[in-house]
């Protein structure tokens, strides 16, 4: 009886501040849950079947997670719907947008073999993203704006271990890279550079 009350309170709290929720949980939400829920930021919560249904929904997709993780995933869902934005991530963007494997490991959801990387505020323009992999690569990269505008890139690389693609930023804003690849593939480096 106490858990449903706690959830009801969580959904009416103001959006949480960066670092309130562990980074690993934020990455998990943004690589698994947000792929469906980022389009639902209408300012309303659509849990028509009640709190128990939302718990069942989270457990069905995220697995049998610890109660604290489950609570944080519910808070992230509420934040996405209320603020119509990704939850703030307490991550320093490396100088020159050159990410190494150590930094990328913090932004990796091993269960889904997916990464969610904040690129920071990008001015309007054309950019080149270069991904360094541990060998043959097959996956999907998405560039996502703060307003949830998403551009998909299907990536395949035979064996060189490096693949690049170009993307366009229409309006200056915060941007993110979400990348999902096959099991056993590791993102070792990421380099984002202006291409104009």
Language-model segment annotations:
Residues 126-128, 168-182:
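Noncatalytic modules at the cell exterior or secretory-pathway interfaces
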Residues 29-40, 73:
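The canonical Cys-X-X-Cys-His
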Residues 22-26, 38-63:
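Gly/Gly-Pro-rich "capping" loops immediately C-terminal to redox-active cysteine motifs
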Residues 119-120, 147-172:
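Beta-sandwich interaction modules
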Residues 82-127:
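Solvent-exposed, flexible loop/coil segments flanking beta-strands in beta-rich domains
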